């Protein structure tokens, strides 16, 4: 199935992440630690931990760092004071935004998130105000040049839900959150190393924006992602390749 890449924003985000590797690693370690605390340190019995580990490895985190984070979480440590919170709101142009956080101080976090929304021309909403527009799923992305038929065979056999080949030759493999790690591990075992892999929220209907509003939305996303307590930010914007090129 061919189409325009719905995931062009991943390449933009990846470039930013390379420049902020330390902060990204901090967020990944926090996710691994909390996942291990909540579900135990055995990744085979803890799907969330397996997904967190897969994402960490996709971002080139070392095995030693991952193992230390697991031990920290499974042993209790100070991660017990951290809780997960989710905020929903609207950005410029009325776009839907979901912000996942991990915090030891809800009041601090909600204040910072609200300030980011307000500063960027958006507003923080109530629980459930936009979440219904999204579906949680895994996505494993490959740069152009991979063997599409071989990749498809491995992915589908491992439990992938859908595979999309884009006009530039890049490929996205979609999974349920539960099957994400199984599919990624099966692909790696067969020599298919992804360009990006994550469990994300995908909007059922995408918002089409002009460049002016898109720039304002990206500024909001950047503000939110720069907050220490923020783990992930999701939007329903259709970041097409053309739009991302205009955004630079």
UniProtKB/Swiss-Prot annotation:
GO terms for cellular component: cytosol. Gene3D superfamilies: 1.10.10.200, 3.30.70.980. One of its GO terms (biological process) is regulation of DNA-templated transcription. Keywords: Cytoplasm, DNA-binding, Transcription, Transcription regulation. SUPFAM superfamilies: YebC-like (SSF75625). Disulfide bonds: none annotated. GO terms for molecular function: DNA binding. It is found in: Cytoplasm. Its main location: cytoplasm. InterPro entries: Integrase-like_N, TACO1_YebC-like_2nd/3rd_dom, TACO1_YebC_N, Transcrip_reg_TACO1-like, Transcrip_reg_TACO1-like_dom3, YebC-like. It holds the Pfam family Transcrip_reg. NCBIfam families: PRK00110.1, PRK12378.1, YebC/PmpR family DNA-binding transcriptional regulator. Belongs to the TACO1 family. This is Probable transcriptional regulatory protein Fphi_1565.
């Amino acid at each position: 199935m061919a189409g325009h890449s719905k995931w062009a924003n991943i390449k933009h985000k990846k470039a930013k992440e390379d420049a902020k590797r330390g902060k990204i690693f901090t967020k990944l370690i926090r996710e691994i630690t909390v996942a291990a605390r909540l579900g135990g340190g055995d990744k085979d019995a803890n799907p969330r931990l397996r997904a967190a580990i897969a994402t960490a490895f996709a971002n080139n985190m070392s095995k030693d760092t991952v193992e230390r984070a697991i031990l920290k979480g499974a042993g209790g440590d100070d991660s017990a004071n951290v809780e997960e919170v989710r905020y929903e709101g609207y950005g410029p142009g009325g776009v839907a935004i979901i912000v996942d956080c991990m915090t030891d101080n809800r009041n601090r976090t909600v204040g910072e998130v609200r300030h980011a929304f307000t500063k960027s021309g958006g507003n923080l909403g109530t629980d459930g105000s936009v979440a219904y527009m999204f579906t949680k799923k895994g996505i494993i992305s490959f740069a152009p040049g991979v063997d599409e038929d071989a990749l498809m065979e491995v992915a589908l056999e491992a439990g992938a839900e859908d595979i999309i080949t884009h006009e530039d030759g890049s490929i996205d493999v979609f999974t349920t959150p539960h099957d994400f790690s199984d599919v990624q591990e099966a692909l790696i075992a067969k020599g298919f190393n992804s360009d990006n892999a994550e469990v994300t929220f995908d909007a059922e209907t995408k918002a089409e924006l002009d460049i002016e509003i898109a720039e304002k939305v990206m500024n909001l996303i950047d503000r939110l992602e720069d907050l220490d307590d923020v783990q992930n930010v999701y939007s329903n914007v259709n970041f097409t390749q053309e739009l991302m090129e205009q955004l630079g």
